[in-house]
Amino acid sequence: MANQDQAYLDLLKKIMTEGNDKNDRTGTGTRSLFGAQMRFDLSQGFPILTTKRVPFGLIKSELLWFLRGDTNIRFLLEHKNHIWDEWAFKNWVTSPEYQGPDMTDFGLRSQKDPGFKAVYDEEMQKFCQRILDDEAFAQKYGNLGDVYGAQWRHWGKRDGGFIDQIADVIEQIKTNPDSRRLIVTAWNPEDVPSSALPPCHVLFQFYVADGKLSLQLYQRSGDMFLGVPFNIASYSLLLSLIARETGLEVGEFVHTIGDAHIYKNHFAQVEEQLKRKPFDAPTLWLNPGKKKVADFEMADIKLVNYQHGSTIKAPVAV
């Protein structure tokens, strides 16, 4: 297997040396490039970074959550995935029912005030446990609305119906593989003004040639150190699952990013990662008894021979 880190590492270097220093909504500041692109040939191994540990279990559970059309964090919490907790927690602490400590600007305050962080961590733990234990509470406060799962599988129509974009694109790949309309979108202009965080992964398109299925993602904004490593592995897994259902071999994952940026408080971590030597890419194992995307569960997806460097911690810009 080949080293699959190189395209990512090369882009990190290019941003650090050629990028534009910009302000951003978090106040942290970034160095960014516009219109970056990376290409990964999945026949050369599964493209999950090896120069630091990337938690594949979180990637699996999040993608399966999207593909279920689920928008409630309860499924994620059942699989010990806390990626989306803060969005649901915000709904709870800003509701009239919440009577606990003041949680205004909890994301920023929890990073800057150790005393507040202890209070925040306790409230978050209680919230997550209540989501797991209380179905009615989970239905009311665990639902995130029109996030990726809803847009992919239940895109609302003007007539009151919905479009299942994933089912539609799978059928089109099978019946009309040369189509240039093999597209799934998550960007709904009507929802953007009211969204806490409008979709970063705006659109992806499939391409069939020589019995291989490829996928290109257009991502409007990419946090290169923390977010993009997840995105690379997640969409490579999505490509692999849909290739399985459509009876095709895996081709390329092409990752196009509008604003590819490194936060200024991640510069030291990036320099550390760039010093590390990559390992060969692991192999993705999919249960040979499963074919349909909808049938896959956590145990049906594994990485074989995933060697990696240690975790490199970095603060989240909020």
Swiss-Prot record:
Entry keyword annotation includes Cell inner membrane: no
Binding, dUMP: R25, R180, R181, R220, S221, G222, D223, N231, H261, I262, Y263
Subcellular location: Cytoplasm
Pathway(s) of this molecule: Pyrimidine metabolism; dTTP biosynthesis
PROSITE patterns attached to this UniProt entry: THYMIDYLATE_SYNTHASE
Catalytic activity: dUMP + (6R)-5,10-methylene-5,6,7,8-tetrahydrofolate = 7,8-dihydrofolate + dTMP
Domain of life the protein comes from: Bacteria
General function of this protein: Catalyzes the reductive methylation of 2'-deoxyuridine-5'-monophosphate (dUMP) to 2'-deoxythymidine-5'-monophosphate (dTMP) while utilizing 5,10-methylenetetrahydrofolate (mTHF) as the methyl donor and reductant in the reaction, yielding dihydrofolate (DHF) as a by-product. This enzymatic reaction provides an intracellular de novo source of dTMP, an essential precursor for DNA biosynthesis.
Quaternary structure and partners: Homodimer.
Protein name in the entry: Thymidylate synthase
Organism: Lactobacillus delbrueckii subsp. bulgaricus (strain ATCC 11842 / DSM 20081 / BCRC 10696 / JCM 1002 / NBRC 13953 / NCIMB 11778 / NCTC 12712 / WDCM 00102 / Lb 14)
